[in-house]
């Protein structure tokens, strides 16, 4: 499996997540969520792994007006709007296959001592 870290270059939690994996010698791929973002399939997979779209949104972030709009539109429109505006998502998003976490959660990123290059993300 390949660890993917979605975040921004300026985000401290994203930097801490990168440092966490780097210090343990675990290979990962960094994807800038503003420049490239997640594909629709990746996005749906992360939403499903984290209890739905509502849990992915950083309601306390800088985009208050956009968050307010998202609260009142249909589910299909919410998905499209957040997919278009991925800066609304809690970051970093750390993916390993179908498993993922939102935010900096080193306690969830369990290391498999037999394979230093793989990480198991528990579903806590």
Located regions from the model:
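Thiol/selenol-based redox catalytic cores and closely related redox-interacting motifs
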Residues: 33-124
């Amino acid at each position: 499996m390949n660890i993917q870290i979605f975040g921004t270059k300026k985000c401290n939690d994203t930097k801490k997540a990168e440092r966490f994996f780097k210090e343990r010698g675990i290979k990962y791929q960094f994807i800038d969520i503003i420049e490239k973002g997640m594909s629709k399939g990746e996005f749906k997979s992360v939403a499903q792994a984290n209890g739905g779209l509502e849990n992915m949104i950083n309601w306390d972030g800088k985009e208050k007006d956009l968050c307010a709009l998202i609260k009142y539109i249909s589910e299909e429109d919410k998905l499209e709007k957040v997919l278009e505006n991925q800066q609304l998502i809690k970051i970093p998003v750390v993916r390993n296959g179908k498993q993922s976490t939102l935010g900096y959660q080193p306690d969830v990123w369990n290391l498999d001592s037999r394979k230093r290059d793989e990480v198991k993300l528990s579903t806590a």
